[in-house]
Amino acid sequence: MKKLLLAIVFSIASILLNAVEQKLLSEKEPETLTNVRILGKTNKSPLSYLPGEEIVFTFTLDTGKDKPGDWRFHFRHGGDGLKIQNGKAPVNKPLIVKTSLTKPGFAFCEVTLHDASGKRIYSETVRPNRKKLKREIIFSAGAAVQPEKLKDCGEPADFDTFWDQQKKRLAAVPFMGKVEKKLVREYKNGYVYAISIPSAGPRPATGYLTIPKNAKAKSLPIHVSFFGYGITKQVPPPVISSRLINFQVNAHGQKLEQNEEYYKDFFKSIGGKGYAYNQKHNKDPETCFFNGMALRNLRALEYVKTLPEWNGKDLIVKGQSQGGLQTMWVTALDPAVTEAHPSIIWCCDLAGSLKQKRFGAFGRVKYTPALEYYDPVFMAKRIRKAKIVITRAGLGDYTSPPSGLAICYNNLATPEKTIKWYQGSNHTIIPPEAEIITWTAGKKVEK
């Protein structure tokens, strides 16, 4: 009898343990793979379609050395003037999605990999610093109908007058003899300084300046870089170049070399993660967050041009996303800039979604007429001499939509201009061996 009871107890315990194990398995983290990727392509060069022509996206799964699982494609597609459509498909055969546009614009199809329960599957890579990076398995494809014909929605009549007034505001705040310059690092080949420069607006222009050791007067080019959107403490660069002066400009005018409590309070004071999204402030071009940022950027350039080591010729600016936005501002507003390298430029064609039914950006600052004074598509018209290389425009990037970048490129007045379109790229991910289409000097070059 005792043996029978023990057998029953063990049997029940086994059933319960198995149930718990199955529950835990069902709640486990999504699969993480190292070799699996989604491949995507179009039936012709993605920027060469005509109105009404069928656009065909084809996607396949490459599992590499990983064993295929019980997976599904999840996809959504849409575009300028199109409604979003969603779907699911098996991964054991090509996924084909067809669409078309009746006028110049962009279409997209985004495909992600999911398990049978609907959870996304991720890839894992190891960075050079040995830290693991986890990313979703995704392909963000895009295609366009006559993108070279896309136009902006019209600029404010007093655009130039407004910026003349802002430059006068900046000039009314002198900075010569008032710059705070503190040595914070010394490397074998140079120095790093924390810089604070008086500026118009609520805060000074700040950033880290690097100057090589033994630099002679009028001997070096200057590189100025701008940062993407975020609220993080800026830290000194870990390395410096012996061949140039570099100024990394802070987007917010934060004090440098402060304790964590300062940065916590500072970011709260400027609006936290939504610092540029305040609708009340964005009703007026002089009260929006971008105003102080732009003035700090211009003041930063004014300062570096006073450095005795500058060769007086080469002033190169760069940045991506919000940094690309700032890069466009200073290149348009300071004729001393000789070369600019913006990437995935943020806030292009802010009015396009409302006025032209172009597919709007995810997480973009909501359009107001006041923000038109900061739109890169209008700044582009004022860039007449500097060499411009838009180093990346993602055909599937709807944080910085491709329609806006196409208009930005089309509007550039300079004869030296280039844009590189990346197939499958969204705002953060570039597929390995991505198809790149390069336009240069107004001509399309297929690669």
Model-based region annotation:
Residues 207-211, 218-229:
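Short beta-strand element of the alpha/beta-hydrolase
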Residues 403-447:
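C-terminal catalytic histidine-bearing segment of alpha/beta-hydrolase fold enzymes
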Residues 353-412, 418:
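The feature captures the conserved acid-bearing segment of alpha/beta-hydrolase catalytic domains
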Residues 41-47, 170-216:
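N-terminal cap/lid segment of alpha/beta-hydrolase-fold proteins
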Residues 214, 275-320:
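Gly/Ser-rich "nucleophile elbow"/oxyanion-hole loop immediately N-terminal to the catalytic nucleophile
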Residues 261-262, 320, 324-369, 421, ...:
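Hydrolase active-site cap/lid region
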Residues 118-154:
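Short beta-strand elements
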Residues 232-295, 349-358:
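Cap/lid segment of the alpha/beta-hydrolase catalytic domain
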